[in-house]
């Protein structure tokens, strides 16, 4: 039986240069502890602002401001149910990044 490895194409200098600004912006957004902690909790699925505030120890109003910034930059998306707003990670790429960070540094 043969095993196949999935090979990712090697990025070119030009493609890396094209994307470095976007990646830098994402890392800046995640450098705030409250925002990083909130998105870490979203890896497990959607959560309301209230649930995230309880999990992170943040005030709901402060956390709402952080989440609004993440939403404006496309890192999270929302769903409204009555007066409750639920947040989820907006892409598989963001979920993968956060899952990697969690696996590498958040060992129990």
Residue ranges of predicted features:
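Alpha-helical residues within the helix-turn-helix
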Residues: 54, 71-72
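Amphipathic alpha-helical dimerization/coiled-coil segments
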Residues: 1-22, 40, 94-108
């Amino acid at each position: 039986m043969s095993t196949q490895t999935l090979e990712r194409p090697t990025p070119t200098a030009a493609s890396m240069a094209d994307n470095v600004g976007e990646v830098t912006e994402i890392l800046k957004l995640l450098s705030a502890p409250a925002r990083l902690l909130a998105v870490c909790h979203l890896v497990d699925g959607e959560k309301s602002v209230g649930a995230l505030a309880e999990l992170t120890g943040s005030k709901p109003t402060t956390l709402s401001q952080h989440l609004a910034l993440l939403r404006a930059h496309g890192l999270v998306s929302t769903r409204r149910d009555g007066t409750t707003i639920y947040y989820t990670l907006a892409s598989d790429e963001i979920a993968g990044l956060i899952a990697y960070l969690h696996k590498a540094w958040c060992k129990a």
